[in-house]
Amino acid sequence: MKTKKFLESKQKSINWQITLKVLIIGVITIALLVPKFMILDLIGQRQHTAEESSKEVMQSWSLDQTVRGPVLAIPYTERNIDSNGKELNEEKEFYLLPKKLEIEGQVFPEIRKRSIYETVVYESAIKMGGHFDISGFDALKIPPENILWEKAKILVAIHDLRGINDRVEFGWNDSVYAFSPGMENKLVGNNGISLQMPQLLPQDFPAHFQFTLNLKGSESLNFAPLGETTEVTLQSAWNDPGFTGSFLPAEHTINNEGFTASWKVLDFNRNFPQQWKNDEYRVTDADFGVKLVTVADHYQKSSRAAKYGILIILFVFLSFFLNEIITKQKVHPFQYILVGFAVLVFYLLLLSISEQLGFNLAYLISSVSVLIMILLYSRTFLKKWVHAIVQTLILTFSFGFIFVLMQLETYALMVGSIGLFLVLALTMFVTRKINWYGE
C-alpha cells in the first residue's frame, strides 16, 4: 500500500516537473523575443545607414533622372473687357506636344562604393526625335492674329540638371539651336532646359526635331509619353532591371549581357491631350522607365529571416524537450537559454557577413558555425553523440526550411503552411505513445 502511494506521489511529482518545464520553456521563449526585436532594430539601422550612404553618393553624382519633353510653349494675347468697358490684353500660353516622339537610349551602369555600401549610377546617351504638327490647333479657338509666334519656346524638363554632361543642341527642320539652362514654366517639371524660337512661323509645320542628351544619373531613368505616339527603346549592360511607372515595356529581353526594352504609348493611354491652353493639364503623372535594381537586398532578406527566428527557437526547444521526455536525460533551463542565444547569434552573424559576402554565402557560413557550436555543446549534456546529432539535424532542417522560404516570395505562405503542418504531424506521431500521466 505504501509502495503504491509512493509511486503515485512520484508520478505526480514527475507530472508536475514536466508541467513546470513546459512553463519555463515558454517563459524563456517569450524572453528571447526581446533580443530578437533588438536584432530586427539593428538590421533596420544598418539598412538606414546603407540608404544614407547611397544618398550621399547620388547627391555627389546625380539623382535619378526623369526626362519630359520637348514641349512647345507659345504665348498668345487674350483680349477682355473689364467692368468699366476698358480693353485689357493679357498674355497667356498654349502648349503643343509632339505628333511623334521617338527615344533611343543607351545606359552605361557603374557601381560606386562608399565604405562597404554600394550604389548603382549610370551615364546615358539619349537620342530624341520626332515632329510637331499644328493640324489640331483650331480646337483651342485662338485667333491667329493673337498668337505671338516670335516668343515661342521649347521646354525639356530634366530632374537633376547636374547630370547633363554636354551642351545640348536642338535640331529644328534645317536649323540648329542651343538650349539654355533653366525653365521658367513648371508645367513639365521643376528643373530643365529651354530654347527661345524667335523665327518660328506657322508655315514651319510639320516641323521635325532631334537632339541628344548625354545624361548621368542614379538608380532609375524615366520618360514622359508626350507624343501622340511615343516609342522608347532602352539598352543596357545591366542584367537586373526593374520596369516602373505607368507603363510596362511592350517587349523586353533580359539576359546575362544586359537588357533591351521597348515601349509604345499612345495619346489615348494618358490623361492629357496634344494641345491645351494655360495650366489646364499637367504631364507629370504618366512617367515610365527602368530602375537599375541592385541585388544587394541582404538587409530585407536578413530582416525576413530574423522574423522567423522565434519559429526556429520553438523547433529547437521542442526537439530538446521531447528528447528529455523520451530519453529521460534532463536539460537545464540555463542550457535552453544558451541554445536560444546561439540561434539569435546566427542572425547577427548573418547580418554582418552578408554585408561583405552577400546573403546566400553568409547564410551558409552563419548556419554551419552555429550548428557546429550547438552540436558540440549539446553533446556535453545529452551524453551521447547520437542524441546531439539528432538535435543538430533538426536545427539544420529548420535553417534549411527558412532558407527555402526566403527564396520563395509568391509561394512562401503555402510552402510555410505545409511545412508547419508536416512538423506538427511528425510531432504528434513521435509523441503518440508517451504516457503523459503515467496511467
Predicted segment positions?
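Generic detector of multi-pass transmembrane helix bundles and their immediately adjacent loops
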Residues: 310-439
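Cytosolic-side membrane-insertion boundary helix
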Residues: 282-313, 331-333
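N-terminal Lys/Arg-rich, disordered targeting/topogenic segments
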Residues: 1-14
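Hydrophobic alpha-helical transmembrane signal-anchor segments
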Residues: 13-41
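Charged, low-complexity helical/coil segments in non-catalytic cytosolic or luminal regions
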Residues: 84, 95, 148-151, 158-181, ...
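Alpha-helical transmembrane signal-anchor/signal-peptide segments
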Residues: 38-63
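Soluble non-transmembrane domains of integral membrane proteins
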Residues: 48, 52, 59, 85-286
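Short extracytoplasmic
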Residues: 55-83
